[in-house]
Amino acid sequence: MTRDYPRTEWDRAVDAVREAHLLLANGGFDGAASRAYYAAFHALTALFALEGRVFTKHSALEAAVHRDLVKAGKWSGDLGRDFSFCVDLRGVGDYGTEVRVDATQAADAIASARRILVAVRDLLPVNFPPVPDG
């Protein structure tokens, strides 16, 4: 992991939120949910990378969010639920066979991801630039 890795992940998170908005606006609800998840994923990857922690499984990152952020009192339970919601909806968007993500769910996933980005930045504002509006 290079010194620039956390910032690169942060930039990917910001890009993914922007992409999720574009997909939502154009009716790509499954893709919007997936990009929202990856926005949260990259933001959290950036946060944990600053501690020298890298996860090779999505489930390990989700466990770390609940154990090291929520249960440790750094984040509210709502933020943990936001991440789990994004995880679950990504599964529908990427792998669902008989179910699709609808517009409301996609918008909710984007809002959840954005709250996660803001919370990550609030923990370490010197490391990450502000989350753009939109």
Residue ranges and their predicted role:
Residues 1-134:
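Terminal alpha-helical segments
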